[in-house]
A protein has these predicted regions:
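Histidine-centered active-site microenvironments of extracellular/periplasmic hydrolases
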Residues: 4-6, 43-99, 108, 154-155
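A hydrophobic, helix-centered structural microdomain
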Residues: 1-19
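Short secondary-structure boundary/capping segments
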Residues: 8-13, 71-74, 160
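C-terminal cap/loop subdomain of S1 sulfatases and analogous C-terminal strand-loop tails that border
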Residues: 63-69, 98, 105, 110-113, ...
């Protein structure tokens, strides 16, 4: 997230490689994030907490750094395209979660709470999401719904006033319903570019 203000030594490393200062700062921020996650993991291991700590990582939106401006590129943040809505969701718990990279199962941040409750062996009330541990239920999910908002909710009583897009997607198709000033567009997912 902005502001991109990495340590000087990381910025100096990437300014020689990047097309411009904004991209160098973004790349340096990525490495800085990796380092701080590594520091956390080392702390947990050093203090014998690693095997009893559930690590969860996710993001609220995608971000593709623009090569031309100090901001996100089109078709990423606040956009219904893959670069804007396809974000990582990662869980780590040694001896419980097997490492896996899965880019085809329909999973969303609404699945975070059911998953954490599942790990804690807590039966929650009916929730919208599905625990990632319930693979059969996840695989049976046919459609995922997404909303892309303007940066701020301007009217808390009517948050849908700032919805830019509503999206329904399955493993093959994505339907993007923009606000009334734009047209409805449909894509075949494998053909859509990430940026």
């Amino acid at each position: 997230h902005t502001p991109h203000n990495p340590p000087t030594e990381l910025f100096d490393k990437y300014i020689k490689l990047a097309p411009n200062e904004a991209v160098a700062k973004y790349w340096a921020m990525c490495e800085w994030f990796d380092k701080t996650v590594g520091d956390l993991m080392n702390y947990l291991k050093k203090n014998s907490l690693e095997e009893n700590t559930l690590i969860v990582y996710t993001a609220d939106n995608g971000w593709i750094q623009s090569n031309k401006q100090n901001r996100y590129a089109p078709r990423s943040k606040r956009a219904p395209h893959e670069g804007g809505i396809r974000t990582p969701i990662m869980f780590k718990l040694p001896k419980v979660i097997e490492p896996e990279m899965n880019t085809s199962t329909l999973v969303s941040n609404i699945d975070l709470v059911p998953t954490v409750l599942d790990f804690l062996n807590i039966t929650g009330e009916k929730l919208s999401g599905i625990s990632i541990m319930e693979k059969d239920k996840l695989n049976a999910r046919e459609t995922l719904f997404v909303e892309c908002y303007h940066h701020d909710i301007l009217n808390i009583e009517h948050p849908t006033e700032t919805v830019l897009y509503k999206v329904a997607l399955n493993k093959k198709w994505k339907l993007m319903l923009p606000n009334t000033k734009m047209v409805v567009r449909e894509f075949t997912l494998p053909d859509e570019q990430y940026y």
